[in-house]
Amino acid sequence: LRISKIIAFSHMQAKFYFNATLTIINKKFNGLFMKIDKVFLASDHAGFELKNELKEAIKGLGYEVVDLGTNDKNSVDYPDYAHLLASKLEPNCYGVLVCGTGIGISIAANRHENVRCALCHDEFTARLAREHNDANVIAFGARVIGAGVAISAAEAFLKTEFAGGRHERRVKKIELEAGK
């Protein structure tokens, strides 16, 4: 046996190339097979107008949108709409929640199993919510950000795939068992 060329890799180089290859395969796999079936939207009275603007923008991107309310500016309780959206969420579906600050509605949504709701304020946080945290619900504060920023953040959220890898290990650690 004659070896004409020997290529030596350090441990770190081999690890880098292996991880880079897995990332490319993962992105291709997700890009080919990951399909968003529906995007559920819900808000309280403070988020009603922004929710409607987001609904039209998301429809314009070609997604099927399900508006769970509220349907006017009359005062309602944000937990009711967070719980409603969380109860409808299923695999390959995402959610968009809006209240005055986004804080209360995101806290309420995160009380549900299999909901990872991220309160986002821009495209960067929305993209990383998906890429690093595999968030399936995004929350906005209508009194905190404008429609333009919310729309661009929602688009980034919906178009970004979960990176997996080291982030998958971390996401698995989020779920805690009661009493431990």
PLM segments and residue spans:
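N-terminal beta1-alpha1 ligand-phosphate binding loop
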Residues: 38-54
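Short active-site oxyanion
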Residues: 38-39, 92-95, 114-116
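Short, structured active-site "lid" loops
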Residues: 81-101
